[in-house]
Amino acid sequence: MPFDSLCRNKIFKDVANYEDIKVDKFMHKLFSSVFTGMGGRYTRLRIICAITENPINAQELSKKMNLDYKTIIHSIDVLEKNNLIIREGAGYGDVFFPSDIISSNLPTLYAVIRKVEAKLDKPGKKYIE
C-alpha cells in the first residue's frame, strides 16, 4: 500500500543522508515491533507522518486519514505506550506530537521500513514512496 501525501517527502526528506548513519539496534527492534510486527502498522506510521507535518488531535487525524475515530485512538494508545508520541492536553482535544525517539531515530525507522519492503517485494505493498 503506497502511502498517500501524508508521508511523501515529509518525514523522510533527508533520506539520501541516512545510508551513512549507524542504525540503533534497540530502536530497530522497537520500530520493527510497532510498525511491522502487528496489525495497524500502516495506520501507526501514517499517524507519525501526519503529526510530524502538523501536530493535531485524534478527531482531526480521523478526518484527515479517513479512518474511524476508535481506530485512531487504538493506534495512538500503542504509540503512546511505546513512547513514540507525546500527548499535550488533558481531554478530548489533546494534541499529539512525535517524541524525540522518532525525530532522533529517523534513519533507523527508514531502515526498518525498507527491510520489510524488501521481504514483501510485491507491487503495491510499499510503506513509503
Descriptions of predicted regions:
Residues 78:
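Alpha-helical DNA-recognition elements
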Residues 89-96, 101:
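Short, Lys/Arg-rich nucleic-acid/phosphate-binding segment
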